[in-house]
C-alpha cells in the first residue's frame, strides 16, 4: 500500500516509530537525570535518530533494564543503611543502645539475666527475627502463643543459642535483673528496635559500671551504676583515670567522685565542658574548659604558644608576665587562669564561636 506522494505506508510508519522512540529516549533520560543527578551515563549511549538509524540501534538506550542496571551500580557504591549499626547492651546500667556508627540513636531500659542466670558477655550478632513468637516452656514443653500471656511478648530478636532480645508480659521487671539470661524490653521499645535493625548486625554485651561521655554542648559527664553482678569494684582513681582521657580529671572534685561512687544511682555527674582552643586562627593541642559559668585556660601552655614568658608562684597562687599579674588555679598537673584575665596577662581576648570553639586573638 502507498499514501499520496508515493512513500510506502509501512516504511513511513517505521520511520515515525524510530523518531518517536528517539524523542522519548531523550526526554526520558532528562527526567531520570533530574531525579537521580548522579546517573549521567545513559545520554552517552543515545544516538541522534535519522532515517538511516535503525530502530534496533535506538531501542537499547530506552529500555528500563539498562536504566535499572545503572541505578543498581550506583547503589552498590553507597553504604547500606544498616551497615554501620550495632547494638550495645550494658548489663550494669541495664540499658540497650542502638548505635549508628559512633552515635547512639536509640536507648531503652531492659531486664537482663538474674545474678544466678546472668546474661553472657561478649560479641554476638542478630541471627533471627520473629514477629509473634511462640514460647516453649523448657521444663514442660508447654507452648504459649504470642499474646498477653506470652513471656516473649510480640517480638523476638535471636542473638545465638537460646538467648534473645524480646518483649515481656511482666513490664514491672524492666530495670531489674529478672530473666534466665535473655534481655527483656518493654513491648513498645522492642517493636521500635525491631523496626530499625536487620539480621546480621553486631550485638555487644558488656558490663561497665562507669560510663563517661561528652554531650553535644561539650560537657563531659560520668555515670556510676550499681554492681548488680558483683563483678567490678571502683574507686576514685578509676574515675579519675577515665576522666583524664577527656582532659577533665583535674576538674572532678575527689569528694564528689567518692559520693557518686557511694550512691551508684546512675544519675549524671557533670564535670566540665571541653572546648577546642584556637590562637589567632590556629588550632592548639590544648583546650579551654568551661565550669560553673567560667572558662578556664591552661596558662603555661598557652603562654608558650603565644611566645610569652610566664612565671607561676605556687605560694601566692599567681601568674605573672611582662604584661601583668593574675590569679592562677592549680588543677592536677596544670595551671589555669580565668579567661577574663587573658587580656591583662597575655594581651589576648577570646570568645566562644557558634561551633563552641574558643577563639583567642
Predicted regions located by residue number:
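Sec-dependent N-terminal signal peptides
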Residues: 2-35
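Primary recognition of N-terminal secretory signal peptides and signal-anchoring hydrophobic helices
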Residues: 6, 24-32, 254-361
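Exported/periplasmic cell-wall-interacting domains
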Residues: 20, 32-39, 45, 64-66, ...
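Cell wall/extracellular polymer interaction/catalysis modules
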Residues: 32-128, 209, 220-228, 244-268, ...
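Extracytoplasmic
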Residues: 82-84, 91-93, 105-107, 121-123, ...
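Solvent-exposed, acidic/flexible segments
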Residues: 89-92, 117-120, 150, 176-179, ...
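Solvent-exposed coil/turn segments that connect beta secondary-structure elements
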Residues: 92-94, 101-103, 113-115, 129-131, ...
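Structured segments of extracytoplasmic/periplasmic soluble domains
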Residues: 99, 129-132, 188, 192-196, ...
Amino acid at each position: 500500500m502507498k499514501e499520496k506522494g508515493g512513500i510506502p505506508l509501512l516504511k513511513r510508519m517505521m520511520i515515525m516509530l524510530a523518531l518517536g522512540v528517539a524523542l522519548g529516549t531523550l526526554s526520558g533520560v532528562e527526567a531520570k537525570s533530574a531525579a537521580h543527578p548522579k546517573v549521567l551515563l545513559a545520554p552517552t549511549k543515545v544516538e541522534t535518530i535519522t532515517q538511516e538509524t535503525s530502530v534496533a540501534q535506538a531501542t537499547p538506550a530506552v529500555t528500563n533494564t539498562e536504566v535499572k542496571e545503572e541505578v543498581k551500580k550506583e547503589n552498590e557504591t553507597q553504604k547500606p543503611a544498616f551497615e554501620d549499626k550495632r547494638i550495645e547492651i550494658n548489663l550494669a546500667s541495664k540499658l540497650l543502645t542502638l548505635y549508628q556508627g559512633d552515635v547512639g540513636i536509640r536507648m531503652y531500659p531492659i531486664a537482663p539475666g538474674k545474678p544466678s542466670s546472668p546474661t553472657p558477655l561478649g560479641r554476638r550478632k542478630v541471627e533471627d527475627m520473629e514477629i509473634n513468637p511462640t514460647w516453649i516452656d523448657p521444663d514442660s514443653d508447654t507452648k504459649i502463643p504470642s499474646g498477653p500471656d506470652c513471656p516473649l511478648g510480640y517480638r523476638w530478636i535471636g542473638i545465638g543459642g537460646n538467648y534473645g532480645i524480646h518483649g515481656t508480659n511482666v513490664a514491672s521487671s524492666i530495670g531489674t535483673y529478672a530473666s534466665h539470661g535473655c534481655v527483656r524490653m518493654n513491648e513498645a521499645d522492642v517493636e521500635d528496635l525491631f523496626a530499625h535493625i536487620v539480621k546480621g548486625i553486631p550485638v555487644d554485651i558488656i558490663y561497665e559500671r562507669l560510663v563517661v561521655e561528652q554531650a553535644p554542648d561539650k560537657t563531659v559527664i560520668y555515670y556510676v551504676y550499681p554492681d548488680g553482678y558483683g563483678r567490678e569494684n571502683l574507686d576514685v582513681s578509676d574515675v579519675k583515670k577515665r576522666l583524664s582521657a577527656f582532659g577533665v580529671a583535674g576538674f572532678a572534685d575527689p569528694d564528689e567522685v567518692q559520693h557518686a561512687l557511694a550512691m551508684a544511682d546512675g544519675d549524671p555527674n557533670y564535670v566540665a565542658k571541653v572546648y577546642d582552643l584556637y590562637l589567632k586562627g590556629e588550632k592548639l593541642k590544648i583546650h579551654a574548659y568551661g565550669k560553673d559559668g567560667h572558662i578556664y585556660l591552661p596558662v603555661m601552655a598557652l603562654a608558650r604558644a603565644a611566645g610569652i614568658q610566664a612565671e607561676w608562684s605556687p605560694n601566692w597562687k599567681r601568674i605573672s608576665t611582662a604584661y601583668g599579674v593574675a590569679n592562677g588555679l592549680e588543677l592536677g598537673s596544670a595551671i589555669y587562669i580565668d579567661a577574663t584575665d587573658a587580656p591583662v596577662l597575655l594581651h589576648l581576648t577570646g570568645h566562644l564561636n557558634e561551633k563552641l570553639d574558643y577563639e583567642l586573638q
